[in-house]
Amino acid sequence: SGTAVGNFYPAIMEAKHANIPLIVITADRSHEERLYGANQTTDQIKIYGDKVKWFVDLATPSNLNGVDVKLYLKKIAAQAYEHSMFDTNGPVHINFPFRKPLEPTQLDLTEYRIDFKPIKVILPEYTFDSKYIKSLIDRCTSSSFPILLLGPDAHREISKDVLTKFVSQLNLTVFVDPLSGFKSDISDRFILNYDVIL
């Protein structure tokens, strides 16, 4: 159905706001059938707008003559994975256009199964040197009212025990985002609903 892609939208919005890596794959009409009102055709180009981190509209399979299709698809898969995981996690969208026949046909997938190799994607890691950490500690201790903001999914980056010790030693007031994964019962210095105060 041309409207089926709309059913993914709530999940994509949730993934966007919760920083959840998600790869959305949709099937589409061929490029030449999109603009003249073919049955059940919805414009799927960037249909999710800024709710996805990355979008690609692939070439129609019959237009890939002379192209190593397996390599082409592996590269797209690697790019999709990288975009969904790098920097801030989030959803990405791959749109696959097809020409008729769309119904199931006989297809030998043996070569794909035998030649399958895992995709290797190297994602950079953020690291901080000791000078930066020392500078951060010095600024916190010299401040009259140091504040720490725990953003969405902060629980994935720091453990409860380490956070509690850090807050206690540096005398921090902590503003806790509802999506951070932490609760105010950890310490009396943790403040929920800080946006109301601000």
Regions found by a protein language model. Name each.
Residues 79, 83-142:
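Conformationally flexible catalytic loops at phosphate/diphosphate-handling active centers
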Residues 3-6, 29-34, 41, 64, ...:
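Short gly/pro/ser/thr-enriched loop/turn and capping motifs at secondary-structure boundaries
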Residues 150-198:
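Glycine-rich, anion-gripping cofactor-binding loops and their flanking helix/strand elements
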Residues 41-90:
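Conserved thiamine diphosphate
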Residues 29, 96-102, 152-154, 179-180:
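Glycine-rich beta-alpha junction loops
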Residues 24-27, 95, 172-179:
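Short internal beta-strands
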Residues 11-13, 28-47, 51, 188-189:
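Active-site-proximal loop->helix
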Residues 1-32:
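Thiamine diphosphate
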